[in-house]
Curated annotation (Swiss-Prot):
Belongs to the DEFL family. One of its GO terms (cellular component) is extracellular region. Keywords: Antimicrobial, Disulfide bond, Fungicide, Plant defense, Secreted, Signal. Disulfide bonds join C30-C77, C40-C59, C45-C71, C49-C73. Residues 1-24 form the signal peptide. InterPro entries: DEFL. The keyword Plastid does not apply. GO terms for biological process: defense response to fungus; killing of cells of another organism. Its main location: secreted. It is found in: Secreted. This is Putative defensin-like protein 160. The keyword Nucleotidyltransferase does not apply.
Length: 77
């Protein structure tokens, strides 16, 4: 019985990890940070995001990334 439970648990973990590996589905919005560590200029941020990802760029503060403001890009996955 213990072997059977362990096998089911292992299969369940494989299925769960496969679902986690899928980053984005169609129609979902993804976010990436552009030019980490550089001060965000809104015009350059929006231009970089639109040309690179066909998305919308905005400046934001991120405590994990040094600097006053960073460029974030929202785009369709």
């Amino acid at each position: 019985m213990a072997k059977l439970s362990c096998s089911y648990f292992f299969i369940l973990m494989l299925v769960f990890s496969a679902l986690l590996m899928v980053e984005c589905d169609e129609g979902k919005r993804c976010h990436t940070t552009i030019d980490k560590g550089n001060f965000c200029d809104l015009v350059d941020c929006r231009l970089s995001c639109f040309s690179g990802y066909n998305g919308v760029g905005k400046c934001f503060d991120d405590p994990k990334v040094p600097g006053r403001s960073n460029c974030g890009c929202l785009y369709n996955c």
